[in-house]
Amino acid sequence: MRFLSRIVLAAALVLVAPAFAQAPKKDVASPALQKEFDGFIGKFRAALKANDSAAVAGMTRLPFMNDGSIRDAAQFHEKIYKREFTAKKRACIQRGKAVYDRDGENNDNYFVFCGDLIFVFTKTPAGFLFTEVGVND
């Protein structure tokens, strides 16, 4: 009976082990990447605190979200900044924790969640840039 119990226990462990072995690893930013992002987000937050849409646009990949109608700082201010960077959302980004993840295209991204929106910052050849605002679903 003892032998049978051990076999059943071993079989159960063999069946459960792959679930633990295949658990997805959480991406972690390298210290150098984290340092680079910390420098960027500090400047971005300072621009938000000053309500400086031109400075924010300077740290944004344009055309914004590949929308040809948002190609420069003036268009960004009118179509994105006024709507998405309210005082409440600016305050949220200033105090919100940025979460790192690497996407399917191997891009390094940080996300700041503010209520129903996600603000996305992506590492580009030019350094980090604000690249997207989307719905937090």
Predicted features by range, described:
Residues 12-20:
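Hydrophobic h-region of N-terminal signal peptides that target proteins for export
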Residues 23-49, 53, 57-137:
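C-terminal-biased regions
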Residues 1-8:
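Bacterial N-terminal signal peptides that target proteins for export
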